[in-house]
Swiss-Prot record:
Role, per record: Forms part of the ribosomal stalk, playing a central role in the interaction of the ribosome with GTP-bound translation factors.
UniProt keyword terms in alphabetical order: Ribonucleoprotein, Ribosomal protein, RNA-binding, rRNA-binding
RNA-binding found in the keyword field: yes
InterPro entries to which the protein is assigned, alphabetical: Ribosomal_uL10, Ribosomal_uL10-like_sf, Ribosomal_uL10_bac, Ribosomal_uL10_bac_type
Organism of origin: Syntrophus aciditrophicus (strain SB)
GO BP terms, alphabetized: translation
Protein name per UniProt: Large ribosomal subunit protein uL10
């Protein structure tokens, strides 16, 4: 690559690095093209991407961003995984892929602007997705309203049952 191309790539990468929600550095030594393509496609479905970038370009692109905190880990052949949406989905994909493929070694990550370890990334992967958490919250909120309606309607319902029993008893006596 000539200097202009490198500068352009660094600027584009800098823009992407400024907007990530999840960033993961991984060693991919020995991984074949087919596996790398599969991983890229899976990540793309979850609003994330995998970039193989030279360490010097990554150092330049990460200046004045939160990713600058990981500069000590920019060593060896690196894959940079950037997630732009819900961080749980890409972390699940990476954790599952790393378990099945020993060639992918997750090194360190960053959640927004906090450095996370591989263990914390695995814990993040165990969380339910955002949609599932929202559904659980909604069911709790609806459950409270349903219980409130049941409690409030219990007194009138009881009164109606007492009056109906009184009416039935009166009809029997007549």
């Amino acid at each position: 690559m000539d200097r202009r191309t490198k500068e352009q790539v660094a600027v584009e990468l800098h823009e992407k690095v400024k907007s990530f929600k999840l960033a993961v550095l991984a060693n991919f030594s020995g991984m074949g093209v087919a596996k790398m393509t599969t991983l890229r496609n899976d990540l793309r479905k979850s609003n994330a991407e995998l970039k193989v970038v030279k360490n010097t370009l990554l150092r330049i692109a990460s200046r004045d961003t939160s990713l600058e905190a990981l500069q000590d880990d920019f060593k060896g052949p690196l894959a940079l995984i950037l997630g732009y949406g819900d961080p749980v989905e890409p972390s699940k994909i990476l954790s599952d892929f790393a378990k099945k493929n020993a060639e992918l070694e997750l090194k360190i990550g960053m959640l927004s602007d906090k450095v996370i370890t591989v263990e914390q990334l695995s814990a993040l992967a165990e969380l339910p997705s955002r949609e599932i958490l929202l559904a659980k919250l909604l069911s709790v909120m609806v459950g409270v309203q349903t219980q409130l309606v049941n409690v409030l309607s219990a007194v009138p319902r009881g009164l109606v049952q007492v009056l109906d029993g009184y009416r039935a008893k009166k009809e029997e006596s007549n």
